A protein has these predicted regions:
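Conserved helicase motor core of P-loop NTPases
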Residues: 1-125
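Low-complexity, intrinsically disordered or weakly predicted helical/coil tracts enriched
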Residues: 62-63, 79, 118, 123, ...
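Glycine-centered loop/turn motifs
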Residues: 113, 129-132
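C-terminal accessory regions
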Residues: 131-139, 144-239
Length: 239
């Protein structure tokens, strides 16, 4: 599929960047920095209006709709996708570099504008597995900001106390698997040559079939990642 994209002269919005270095490409780290700075600006524009943290505020969208829409537009402007959570070119690899932290993450002291993801359904709070939000506010005003549907199926935003939602991870980058159902104007994919062998390989006696399963898995995974992009796509390929 990568060769197809490279040979497609019409794909002006697609960039294939090969690397032999196991370090995260510097060009991508610079883009991540720009992305987080943009989010930090839009979240700070909202959080500096301290009245928004009052319990009596009610529907936040009715007060600061434009600022909130800016945050979620910025949040959805770039999606960084990895094949895996750990190892070379992984989600945790990026978190390590960008945040300087490993699990468990200190969400109270991280800077505003860091994207976050809920990893388990929480029916009481109305947050689902895979929902992406952002850190907002400082110190006693630190909150998780999520957009969700209320009981009337209306789209609303909600401040959530970090202490009430435990299953949260940074979402600077996410796995391709977790990205299913998401879209972004720009997608950057970190892709390695090492194949993930299908878990049913022990049932296959014919080696050619084993290779077919492995390639088929990779093809589906890469297809899922590529189709998250609405306008621009960068594929970083570890060769």
């Amino acid at each position: 599929k990568i060769k197809e994209l490279e040979n497609d002269k019409k794909s002006k919005e697609v960039n294939i960047l090969k690397s032999i270095n196991k370090n995260i490409p510097l060009s991508l780290l610079n883009e991540i920095e720009d992305y987080i700075n943009k989010l930090r600006t839009s979240t700070t524009n909202l959080s500096k209006k301290e009245y928004i943290f009052q319990n009596s505020i009610g529907d936040l969208m009715s007060h600061e709709k434009d600022l909130i829409n800016n945050i979620f537009t910025d949040l959805q402007s770039h999606l960084i996708l990895c094949e895996k959570n750990t190892g070379t070119w992984s989600v945790e690899n990026i978190n390590d570099i960008v945040l300087g932290q490993r699990k468990p993450y200190d969400f109270i002291n991280l800077e505003e504008g860091i994207p976050i993801m809920c990893t388990e359904n929480n029916n009481e709070l109305g947050i689902s597995n895979g929902d992406i939000g952002v850190l907002i506010g400082k110190n006693e005003n630190r909150k998780f900001l999520f957009r969700k549907f209320n009981d009337n199926n209306d789209l609303v935003v909600d401040f959530i106390e970090p202490s009430t939602l435990n299953n949260v991870v940074p979402a600077i980058a996410i796995t391709i698997h977790k990205s299913q159902g998401s879209e972004s104007e720009k997608v950057s994919i970190l892709w390695t040559q090492k194949s993930q062998i299908n878990k049913y390989k022990e049932d296959l006696e014919d080696e050619s079939k084993l290779m077919f399963f492995r390639d088929s898995y990779e093809k589906r995974l890469l297809y899922t990642a590529i189709t998250r992009a609405k306008s621009f796509l960068d594929i970083y390929f570890l060769n």
